[in-house]
């Protein structure tokens, strides 16, 4: 009788452990269902973003990158300062078996009266060509534009590697005033990049 009771208790214990293990596995599965592509940091340089002149912020989940510039200002009435550029290098941590591509980029800035400005941006990975976007603005205007890269080109990094996104942006100005990318009001202007990813084929 004692041995039968022990056997019954053992069976119940095993069943309980199996149920507990199933619950743990079920609750843990979503955490591994969607691997994340994570933005690590950003490096920058150029006449429009000399060292120490930009503020770089990465969101807590690593999905968004924001840059705020202090000196990305082209002067239309100064030939030496009429074009400013900024080259960005953004290391991205890519999960094994996935590729990364650009999704979109938002730009905000200002063009003063009697000024024509041209914003040009190229997006690529090292050793690859990517799409180029150009826009012309006539001052006075506060602009807020988006380069919707997903609708134009799929620029994918190599499978299973951490990659450096590269963005070469330039602002040119003609006329009496200035054209900026993120100037003065940091709460409303800046540059934000988003990303998308897919499984390797």
Name every feature range the model reports, one short phrase each.
Residues 115-128:
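Short, surface-exposed beta-strand/strand-loop-strand elements in extracellular ectodomains
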Residues 1-12:
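N-terminal secretory signal peptides that target proteins for export/translocation
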Residues 133-163:
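Short, surface-exposed tryptophan/glycine-enriched loops
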Residues 173-201:
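Proprotein-processing/basic-patch segments
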Residues 32-76:
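N-terminal leader/pro-regions and domain N-caps
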Residues 159-176:
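Internal, hydrophobic beta-strand segments that form the core of beta-sheet-rich folds
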Residues 99-112:
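A short beta-strand element within beta-rich, extracytoplasmic domains
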Residues 75-83, 91-100:
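Short, solvent-exposed beta-strand/turn "edge" segments of beta-rich domains on protein surfaces
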């Amino acid at each position: 009788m004692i041995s039968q009771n022990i056997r019954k208790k053992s069976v119940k214990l095993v069943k309980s452990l199996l149920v507990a293990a199933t619950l743990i596995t079920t609750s843990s599965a979503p955490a591994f269902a969607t691997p994340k592509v994570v933005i690590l940091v950003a490096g920058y340089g150029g006449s429009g973003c000399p060292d120490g002149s930009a503020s770089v912020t990465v969101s807590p989940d690593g999905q968004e990158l924001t840059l705020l510039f202090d000196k990305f200002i082209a002067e239309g009435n100064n030939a030496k300062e009429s074009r400013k550029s900024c080259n960005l290098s953004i290391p991205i941590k890519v999960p094994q078996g996935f590729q990364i591509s650009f999704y979109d980029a938002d730009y905000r800035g200002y063009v003063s009266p009697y000024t024509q400005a041209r914003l040009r941006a190229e997006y690529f990975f090292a050793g690859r060509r990517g799409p180029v976007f150009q826009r012309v603005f006539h001052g006075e205007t506060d602009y807020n534009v988006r380069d919707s890269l997903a609708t134009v080109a799929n620029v994918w990094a190599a499978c299973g590697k951490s990659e450096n996104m590269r963005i070469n942006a330039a602002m040119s100005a003609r006329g009496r005033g200035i054209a900026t990318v993120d100037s003065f009001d940091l709460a409303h202007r800046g540059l934000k990049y988003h990303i998308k990813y897919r499984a390797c084929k």
